[in-house]
Amino acid sequence: MTEISPAARADLTPTGKLRVGINLGNFLLTAKDPATGESRGIAVDLGRELGRRLDAPVEIIGYPTPGELADAAASGAWDVGFLGAEPHRAKEIIFTAAYVEIEATYLVPPGSPLGAIADVDRPGIRIAVPERSAYELYLSRT
């Protein structure tokens, strides 16, 4: 394992602990354990592992939506956050390489005339996505 410099450790843990921001709105990445109320999932596991490597205590900070998680970056509420990289967010947040890629698709009712991407990707077709998610940010700019 690569040695973490004291400067990097100080940058990542300015409060003496690693504050990990997670998006509770994406069950593929994190969820609340119904029995304990604790957050769990890949984002939580990665945050805890980073804290272990930094030899720092970890505080998991959950946000109901990715938009709220992204907004909290400006106030310094978290040190490391797990959310989709998107050019709009990159104005305020420095992103690493992706730790996971999630494919998205369309869900339509039976008998829908929308059977192919070309049927959907045209003016006048509305697509429901979580507000201020990476999906919405992508669709808004393309």
Regions found by a protein language model. Give the residues of each.
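N-terminal hydrophobic or amphipathic helices and topogenic motifs
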Residues: 1-59, 68
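Short loop->beta-strand "edge-of-pocket" segments that line small-molecule binding or catalytic clefts
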Residues: 17-23, 40, 118-136
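Active-site/binding-pocket entry motifs
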Residues: 25-28, 87, 113, 134
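Residues that cap or flank secondary-structure elements
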Residues: 38-39, 61, 108, 127
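Alpha-helix N-cap/helix-start capping motif
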Residues: 44, 85, 132-133
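Acidic, polar ligand-binding/catalytic clefts
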Residues: 48, 52, 57-121
